[in-house]
Amino acid sequence: MATTIQREGLPHREIHEVHRIDHDGAVDADGHILEPPDLWDEYLESKYKDRSLRICLDENGLEELEIGGERSVMSRRGFPATLGAMGAPDLADIQRNPERTYLHEAPFGSMDPLQRLEVMDAENLEAAVIYTTVGLLWEAELNDPELSQAYTRAYNRWVVDFCRDSRSRLIPSAHLSLSDPEAAATELRRAVDDGAKGCYVAPFTHSATPLGHPKNDIVFRTAEELGVPFAIHPTFEPQWTKGDRMGSWENVKQLRLTASITASDGVRHQFTTLFD
């Protein structure tokens, strides 16, 4: 039986070495946070809490993701602890060592908005657009539109709360799931009304429907009407997408992802002000 990890305060690590930007007014356009491990237990509607997104301990004491009540098959045991340690030389040890945990390895400023502002001051950053981290992992394994929408609503409520008292320096971007375009459009309106300043989606749908398909027009139209930016963020993806739809990770970095959606599907021509 997996044991759910709960938050016991925030990480207490010291601020890490930072690179200070010489020029004033810079904005971090890809400012990821690490979600508190009990975020979905706290913010998910009651009817879904038995299938909450969780970080649990396996029988060997290693952390793992639990998605929709099932063990993650794409995130290896011990993987959660590595999420805050990108580029670390001892990444393999982090993943194999039960004493090195998601909370223990979380960098200063990754879960606490006041700490994040302190890091930004040290870096001379004016603002940061906030994106999810754990949220980039679950959608590839959850082919349940209703629960997917519930997961995004929970995260969006939390991230707006995270950013709320930052004097507009922390800019929340809402996570949308195109598993149900009408529900996603409704959530975008709710999230923006609550304080979100933009939105993003995964680069795939479980139905294999292209993101630029007319059935998703309601989401693009809503973003355009609200005057908020719409982003497509790389995520974990189902195995069927590998090497078939967009090619390699290099292709994503070369913006073929955006080009294929906006050009071939005509989104750029139909929703003109969305690209202003």
PLM region spans:
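Helix-coil boundary/capping segments in enzymes
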Residues: M1-D276
